Amino acid sequence: MIPGEYQIQPGDIELNVGRRTITLKVANSGDRPIQVGSHYHFFETNDALTFDRAASRGMRLNIPASTAVRFEPGQSREVELVDYAGHRRVFGFAGRVMGDL
């Protein structure tokens, strides 16, 4: 192996196979853009985002790690969310859960 070299398997890599997903319509009712990262607990996003918040509890965006979705002021779009895996405990973010989901 050469330092810094990547050894990637050929073919496509499927993300979050077998996990529950939902699609929600999300609108930015604020006057500034809002960006949400791939692993941010969607339930705890900025209050200027309007959507079925209760349905998003325990879920994150179903996008590749280290990417994000940006919502411009007045913009509305559908996003796909996926269940958190593992122990399903959430700490930090906006502090709305701080424990088991």
Curated annotation (Swiss-Prot):
CDD domains per the UniProt record, alphabetical: Urease_beta
Keywords: Cytoplasm, Hydrolase
TM helices/strands, residue ranges: none
GO cellular component: urease complex
Source organism (scientific name): Pseudomonas fluorescens (strain Pf0-1)
GO molecular function: urease activity
Pathway, per record: Nitrogen metabolism; urea degradation; CO(2) and NH(3) from urea (urease route): step 1/1
NCBIfam families: PRK13203.1, urease_beta
Recorded family membership: Belongs to the urease beta subunit family.
Pfam families assigned to the protein according to its UniProt record, in alphabetical order: Urease_beta
GO biological process, one term: urea catabolic process
Catalysis: reaction(s): urea + 2 H2O + H(+) = hydrogencarbonate + 2 NH4(+)
Location in or out of the cell: Cytoplasm
EC number(s) per entry: 3.5.1.5
Protein name: Urease subunit beta
Quaternary state and interactors: Heterotrimer of UreA (gamma), UreB (beta) and UreC (alpha) subunits. Three heterotrimers associate to form the active enzyme.
